[in-house]
Amino acid sequence: MEETMNNQEAPETSEEETVAVENTKAEKVLPNFGPGDTIKVHARIKEGDKERIQMFQGVVLKVKQAADGGNFTVRRISYGVGVERTFPFLSPNVTKVEIMKKGRVRRARLFYLRKLSGKAARIKEVKQTPS
């Protein structure tokens, strides 16, 4: 039984994956955004053997910072139905993030927006002063 276990190669995850994750961290530079901001996420979608870039524009509900990169959740209304997507910061499928509007909110988690609709779900926009 020991011979069969020795013949099987264990997946080498320690060095190779660590180097890959560190390279991803070094290459990924996303703009500084937070809850309440309206952003456009360019996500790589694989359908069968084809790949394409799909844009997902919506309001950031939460940003979770973590040692492994963290993630952020974006919500939009599509054909009258609320759609939320969570994107990892270090995902190779997130190609680009654009900030469309900066929102002014007083909460770190905007889950209350799920219950609101129409004008009640609006977020005040922060006016950018020219530098």
UniProtKB/Swiss-Prot annotation:
GO terms for cellular component: cytosolic large ribosomal subunit. Keywords: Ribonucleoprotein, Ribosomal protein. Residues 1-11 have a biased composition (Polar residues). Residues 1-20 are annotated as: Disordered. It comes from the Bacteria. The keyword Ribonucleoprotein applies. It holds the Pfam family Ribosomal_L19. It comes from Dehalococcoides mccartyi (strain ATCC BAA-2100 / JCM 16839 / KCTC 5957 / BAV1). GO terms for biological process: translation. This protein is located at the 30S-50S ribosomal subunit interface and may play a role in the structure and function of the aminoacyl-tRNA binding site. InterPro entries: Ribosomal_bL19, Ribosomal_bL19_CS, Ribosomal_bL19_sf, Translation_prot_SH3-like_sf. GO terms for molecular function: structural constituent of ribosome. The keyword ATP-binding does not apply. PANTHER family: LARGE RIBOSOMAL SUBUNIT PROTEIN BL19M, RIBOSOMAL PROTEIN L19. This is Large ribosomal subunit protein bL19. Belongs to the bacterial ribosomal protein bL19 family.
